[in-house]
Amino acid sequence: MRNQDAALACEVLNEEFSKEIEMGEISPVVAEMNLATIAIVGENMKHTPGIAGKLFGTLGRNGISVIACAQGASETNISFVVESKSLRKSLNVIHDSFFLSEYQVLNLFICGTGTVGGSLIEQIRCQQQKLMQERGLKLKVVGIADGHHALFTRAGVDLSHYKEELAEKGMPSSTQVLHDEIIGMNIFNSVFVDCTASAEVASLYKDFLMNNISVVAANKIAASSEYSVYSELKQIARRRGVKFLFETNVGAGLPIINTINDLINSGDKILKIEAVLSGTLNYIFNKISADIPFSKTIKMAQEERYSEPDPRIDLSGKDVIRKLVILAREAGYKLEQEDVEKHLFVPNDFFEGPLEEFWKKV
């Protein structure tokens, strides 16, 4: 019914059933506002098991709460009630699951357009058609953000010209904008991809997961921060039926974390891991010589895109420590960064002050 009729309807019904309410046989009638009813009707639903389970399972995985439901005795329809704000998302989920199943749509929000983010966007652009044709998977980038601008569109960003679109049509970017726009769009089957090295962006993961948005992070900060934060994010993801993945935190494109997960899940206990965990340091030590000074090898590592934007993160051992902590945690150990012993080959005072001072010292 219309919102303006709700109060009168409650009054009439409570008056009609006043005796039953007084005797405690029924509860007083109350009105819940801003709701919507969706009905699925189909002849083929009759005597077909699993339709209701598929429907409510799909809604649940996308964070849509069903307030009430009913199924007709003829088994040809299911009606249910959701919040009005979830109506569009519910319809999209149902159409994708039941009627438009030629492709499974995955809606991506990509934060960061630098070396990692830019390469990912280009890879998606090149593989979109192949994935649709061979895997039935339609990757749609519905949001892109860098340090200056953020662009969101349900229709999907044209990845061939995303830089121009971002500069011309994008709004000023901030973590608050990312938070509000991504959650506010309320899009089904959505994934937030963090290609930054920002602690502020990492702080958004919890709210995204709570709103049934999966998180895939190249950013190491969340998975290597306090163990309580790492553990909470994984627990929320499990409870909400979404993913919190960070495979590229260690080993770039190699499936190291996934392999550790498989070993642990099959009952193995990992006692020791040996690895060269810093591509930057490995590159520097291979290049440094009497002819190539230390400072030049650092510059070369940056030019070859081995190094972090701030090379001190690599040289201080911070990046390696983060990777060690992540590997240990995935192997089942409750390790903090402070538990890792480090021996630096660069004097401590090199890491003090601004980046310009560091370059002068090396």
Spans of model-derived segments:
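Rossmann-fold NAD(P)-binding glycine/threonine-rich loop
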Residues: 198-211, 220-248, 252-263
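A conserved regulatory-domain signal marking ACT and ACT-like small-molecule sensing domains
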Residues: 1-122, 127
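Predominant activation on well-ordered alpha-helical scaffold segments within soluble catalytic domains
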Residues: 7-14, 53-60, 88-95, 117, ...
